[in-house]
């Protein structure tokens, strides 16, 4: 099986050693699923927004990339049981004057292209301008360079950046619920495979493997 994943979105996807080794919660979870499927899995890393055409055009068999189940995505693809609840989080630089959701009024917000976060920003009706970035590194750079006033990203990713660079960033407000959880995405004709994956996810939860993997990252 060829598994499509995101180029870089810690703690879900992390490249290390000159991009030769890939790890992270999504990767470890998928490798365990592959082991239980008795399948050989190869990971292909894409810019997040390119994962959708890659799956549609069958360059990959499955996608795991902190992929949120949304109504829009369900029109085109099928999803496994969610393996984690999905939340978003606003983040800004430590010296920013933005401290609350109200302070976000009329501000420029950076989001990763292909995520449901642009829609979430605009639905808050704060007259925001959304700036799209292909890579999370570029989005954080845009934040540092004042191209944007704040960014909206996966809650776990925001917590990761806060922990790794506490003197650079701060969180704005609490996490916000979005979608129906993080899930493994497939083309509709792969429903038999998704059923097998669902069974494995439940087994992993029951035998403690899921909690062990989760505890390594969160």
Located regions from the model:
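Periplasmic-binding protein-like
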Residues: 7, 84-92, 155-202
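Extended ligand-binding regions for polar small-molecule ligands
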Residues: 27-36, 95-98, 102-103, 107-108, ...
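Extracytoplasmic small-molecule ligand-binding "clamshell" domains
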Residues: 1-66, 75, 132
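Ligand-binding clefts/hinges and TM-proximal coupling segments of bilobed small-molecule sensing domains
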Residues: 116-133, 169-175, 201-218
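Short, well-ordered beta-strand segments
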Residues: 2-5, 91, 108-111, 151, ...
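Short, Asp-centered acidic motifs that coordinate Mg2+ and/or phosphate
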Residues: 1-2, 57, 61-62, 149-150, ...
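A ligand-binding cleft/hinge motif common to bilobed small-molecule-binding domains
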Residues: 50-53, 65-75, 120-123, 137, ...
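A conserved helix-loop-strand patch within extracytoplasmic ligand-binding domains
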Residues: 39, 43, 47, 68-69, ...
């Amino acid at each position: 099986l060829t598994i499509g994943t995101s180029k870089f979105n810690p703690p879900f996807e992390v490249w290390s050693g000159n991009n030769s080794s890939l790890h992270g919660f999504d990767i470890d979870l998928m490798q365990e699923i592959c082991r239980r499927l008795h399948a050989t899995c190869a990971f292909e890393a894409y810019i997040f927004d390119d994962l959708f055409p890659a799956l549609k055009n069958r360059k990959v068999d499955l996608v795991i990339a902190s992929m949120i189940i949304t109504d829009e995505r369900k029109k085109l693809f099928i999803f496994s049981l969610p393996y984690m609840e999905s939340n978003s989080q606003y983040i800004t630089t430590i010296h920013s004057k933005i401290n609350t959701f109200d302070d976000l009024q009329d501000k420029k917000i950076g989001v990763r292209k292909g995520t449901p976060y642009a829609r979430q920003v605009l639905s808050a009706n704060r007259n925001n301008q959304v700036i799209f970035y292909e890579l999370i590194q570029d989005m954080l750079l845009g934040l540092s360079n004042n191209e944007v006033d704040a960014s909206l990203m996966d809650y776990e990713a925001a917590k990761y950046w806060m922990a790794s660079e506490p003197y650079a960033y701060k969180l704005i407000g609490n996490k916000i619920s979005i979608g129906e959880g993080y899930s493994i995405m497939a083309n509709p004709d792969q429903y038999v495979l998704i059923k097998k994956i669902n069974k494995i996810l439940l087994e992993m939860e029951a035998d403690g493997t899921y909690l062990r993997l989760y505890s390594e990252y969160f």
